[in-house]
Structures are given as C-alpha cells and as structure tokens.
Amino acid sequence: KASSIGVILEGVILIFILTLVIIGKQISSDFVILNATPIEWIILLTWLVGLYLIYKNPTLKNSKLLKEEKKLPAISKKKAHTALLIFTFCAIIVLISGVLLEMSSEEISNRFHISGVIFGATILAAVTSLPEISTGIASAKLKDYQMAVSDIIGGNAFLPVLLLVGSIISGTSIIKSIGPTDIYFTCLAILLTGIYLVGLIVKSKHQYLRLGYDSFAILMVYVLGLLGLLYIVK
C-alpha cells in the first residue's frame, strides 16, 4: 500500500499550500512583487521546500520499492531517450487539450444554460482528471501505488503555484480575484485531504468492495460538497 511517510508528507504539504491560498485571499495588501502578492511567492516557496523534504525523506531511500528497482535490468540510453520524447509529446498534447477544453466548456455551459461553476466542478473536473485516472490505472497494474497517489496529491499541490505564474503573465494578482466558490472548493479539498491522511494512518480492518471506511467517507463528503455548491450558486 501507498501509506508511506512520504505520501503523508505530500498530503500535509498540500494542506499547507491550500491554507495559504485562503489566507492570501483574506489579505488586502497592495504590495506586490512582479505583479504577484507575497503570499503567492510563499506558496511557491512552500512547494519547493516540500519537494526538498520529500526528496530528503530517509524512508524513501530505504523503501521496498527502491530495493526492487535496484534489481531491475539497466535501461539503454536509446530507450530512455525514446521514453523522454514520448513523455514530452504527451505532456504537450495534454496542455493543448486543456486549452481546448476550457474554450469548449465555456461554449457548452452558455449554450445549455448551465452554471459555469456547476459545469466546471462536475463535467470539466471529471474530464481534466482523465490523465490522473489513466496514470493511476497504469500505476496500479505495475503495483506502484505510491506513484498513483503521489500523482494526484502532487498535481493538486502544484496547481496553486500556477497562481504566481498567472499573476506575472497577466500583470495583476490572481489570488485577489478568487471568489467564494473557489474558497469553498479549497476548504473542501483540505477536508478531503485530511480524511485521506487519517485513512493512511488509521487502517480500516473491514473493507467493502475493496474500499475502507475512509474511502466511503471521502466519497460521501465529496457528494455532499457538490450538493452544498448548489446553495452557493443560488
């Protein structure tokens, strides 16, 4: 299972970063650095420090996974370069697809008179999660569960860093334009991450459909969170 100290550390860092987003919204200072507020730079610093702590985590160096990797045959440079090219190509495709999804989702929500918030929180969120789903399935087949979990948590931790990039490019601080719905989803993400971390520490002795109590709790809280979104939209 992926219940290692490294994954728990990733979850804690994610909670730190999401909390900083909420704090940044509440601070009404006009002081900016390269069009970005200090809190946006602190988010970047927190993310970088988190990467360093994960890299230096001693449990990762002695993990069973690394011991098994040492037994694997060496990969030729040609195969490694080919894999790198494929990885880069797929990353570019995902980037272009993200732009097209944003454009098409706005058109669909306007045409069918669907709230942009509702559409983005459900359909668009599910579609943009397809890379994580496919990566998770592939990692599960390889029995590399830690990679599957780290992909999800790491991706969520990196996204707030893009607030800094967006602020620098657009010329105005994006974190100041965050609305109540964004704060709501940020709090929901913190709550879900907290439940997940509890599930990693406190193991479920009983499972149903190969899912523990923590998984059902996460699903229930997420559904209730979406229902609560309806009251915010109103």
Question: Which residues does each PLM region occupy?
Answer:
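Hydrophobic alpha-helical segments, chiefly the membrane-spanning helices
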Residues: 1-234
